[in-house]
Amino acid sequence: MHSSKARYLVFFQYYGTKYSGVMETPITQSVLGVQNYLEVAAQKLRPVGTIKFFISSRTDSGVHAICNLAHVDIERAKGKPPFTEEILVQAMNHHLQPEPIRLLKAIRVCDNFHARHNALSRTYVYRVAAGCSRPELPVFEGNLCWAIQDGLNVTAINEASKMLLGTHNFSAFRSANSENAFKSPIKTLQQADINPSCGILTHHWQSRNLQFWDFTFRARSFLYKQVRRMTGALVAVGQGRLTPQQIKEFLENQDPNCFLGNFVAPPHGLFLKDVEYDGTELNGFSAEETQKYSSHLN
């Protein structure tokens, strides 16, 4: 008989406003993490033992995820085959209600697959609404973008963003008091660009001069709040408060005490968009093997 224990890679999204972040927190806290709710929902599937999710990418309080990932081991009672991927998603989403957390899909992976360690890259998108203050922002955009009063000089932003590309010491974009100060500040930024975007249901209402922009960043990993600091600095360039040359100088000076701390974008405009893996690692179980397990449920 096949083992009833299985490792799954789960794809999930969440509206991060009401959570302390994605990582679990002590249950005595008034505000919990997304992981707390995932594990409570999984325990309702009546597994053998305690469920533990291993999150691919950490997000802070107020930050959202279009798609985050985690791996989880689920063992069922003796004689019961592992959940099919479809049933796992359906059951988890049922038990997650009414939380704004949803499983998108699940994939059976090999027992040595690790959602965080095996990730090749992570992509974040930061949404900016230029042309209005936050009180003037359409209600549907509430905690989903950063509203700034004036327009942006996109040409200057593009010039500055190119300086961030490649491998650099990003000490200037980390907190001087960071708990992770022991981690290497050397990061390789594979993508840093800005593109026009649209708001929610914008074709149904007059947006005056409101313009939405997506700031997109991709790297294997980032420093704590690095994306929000890069976004804040680039917006400052677009507003004329910083120059592209100053961005280059900050990188070269490698000083975490520089005044970039005054240009940290708020959390509510940030989304984890995607996590990339080697596709061959996501094929731990063949279609034939999966069919064998599925047949036990019929």
UniProtKB/Swiss-Prot annotation:
Presence of keyword Transport: no
GO molecular function: pseudouridine synthase activity; RNA binding; tRNA pseudouridine synthase activity
Protein name in UniProt: tRNA pseudouridine synthase-like 1
Top EC group: isomerase
Active site: 60 (nucleophile)
Pfam families on file: PseudoU_synth_1
Keywords of this entry: Isomerase, tRNA processing
Binding residue positions for substrate: 124
Family from the record: Belongs to the tRNA pseudouridine synthase TruA family.
Catalysed transformations (reactions): a uridine in tRNA = a pseudouridine in tRNA
SUPFAM superfamilies named among the record's database cross-references: Pseudouridine synthase
Domain of life: Eukaryota
